[in-house]
């Protein structure tokens, strides 16, 4: 499953970064225009707005793809995804953060990232 989720997550993180860059650029255009008593216009503004719209749609699509796999995207900035699982008959989340080699942590459904425990501890 991680083999399918990881590339989606990598793409989402890159798209989120690009979205923020375009949003910042658009905000700069708008601030300059307001400072001059006008409205932001022109091809650069149109291109930035189109990029924001396109990236927003792509991010939504990527999130839906991750959810369709049964995973829960917890934090896009961290690249954090939970995989529902059972441990001793209890519902838990297997927890993965982008950049980790494999799924090596878990936490209870009422716990978050701070409550992660190593899977190896269960095998000792």
Where are each of the predicted segments found?
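Glycine-rich, aromatic-bearing surface loops/beta-hairpins
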Residues: 53, 60-124
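Structured domain cores in non-transmembrane regions
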Residues: 22-56
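A structural signal for well-ordered alpha-helices, especially hydrophobic packing surfaces
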Residues: 9, 16, 56-59, 63
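Generic structural signal for short, flexible, solvent-exposed coil/loop and linker residues
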Residues: 1, 8, 34, 41, ...
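Short secondary-structure junctions and interdomain/linker hinges
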Residues: 16, 33, 69-73
């Amino acid at each position: 499953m991680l083999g399918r989720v990881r590339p989606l997550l990598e793409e989402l993180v890159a798209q989120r970064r690009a979205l923020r860059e375009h949003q910042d650029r658009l905000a700069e255009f708008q601030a300059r225009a307001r400072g001059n008593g006008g409205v932001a216009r022109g091809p650069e503004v149109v291109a930035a707005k189109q990029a924001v719209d396109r990236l927003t749609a792509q991010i939504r699509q990527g999130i839906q793809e991750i959810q369709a796999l049964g995973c829960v995207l917890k934090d896009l900035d961290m690249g954090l995804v939970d995989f529902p699982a059972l441990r001793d008959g209890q519902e838990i989340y297997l927890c993965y953060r982008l950049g980790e080699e494999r799924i090596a942590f878990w936490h209870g459904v009422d716990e978050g990232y701070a409550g992660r425990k190593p899977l190896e501890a269960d095998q000792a």
